[in-house]
């Protein structure tokens, strides 16, 4: 499962678990973004986001964490992520799992036309959005039926934005994310800066999930 994970929370974990079950995936790889190119806000340091993701996923044997985006220089583009994962797992079928709201903007992503040749897409519901055909426009509506699946994730009402704001406002994080991540956030004093985050000034991309099956 990929994205900024700033911070990772139970919404990410539930989405990954539900999609893994639905598509009988052997593994869900969480891929923290390195230097994302799209969202216009500051994010926490890549190593902090990577370590929080490792802590959050450690207890699930089906979950793993990849450094493929963090270790790549330059901005993080989904096309590069999927290409690299294909190279590392040439015999696997990849699934690109993202928020349903992000599907409407996918045509603006660099190399979007290559993505459907590399992976199947799964759009999951996110806070404040309803699944529907309005998320699929233009070229996307002409794709083969199995190229894109919409999935509603139960009780997916937690967001990273809310978690950051709760820290800034000195509100509790318990039960919104694994205990180890809560402890890491406070030990590292994350999300207490002027923008509600501590980090390197890098920008973020839409959340995504990449998994594979046999």
Swiss-Prot record:
Which terms are listed as keywords in the entry?
Answer: ATP-binding, NAD, Nucleotide-binding, Nucleotidyltransferase, Pyridine nucleotide biosynthesis, Transferase
Its EC number(s): 2.7.7.18
Pathway, per record: Cofactor biosynthesis; NAD(+) biosynthesis; deamido-NAD(+) from nicotinate D-ribonucleotide: step 1/1
Q: Which domain of life is it from?
A: Bacteria
Q: Which GO terms describe its molecular function?
A: ATP binding; nicotinate-nucleotide adenylyltransferase activity
Query: Mind telling me what this protein is named?
Result: Probable nicotinate-nucleotide adenylyltransferase
Outline what the protein does. Catalyzes the reversible adenylation of nicotinate mononucleotide (NaMN) to nicotinic acid adenine dinucleotide (NaAD).
Give the family from UniProt: Belongs to the NadD family.
| GO BP terms, alphabetized | NAD biosynthetic process
Catalytic activity, reaction form: nicotinate beta-D-ribonucleotide + ATP + H(+) = deamido-NAD(+) + diphosphate
Task: Tell me if Signal is a UniProt keyword of this record.
Answer: no
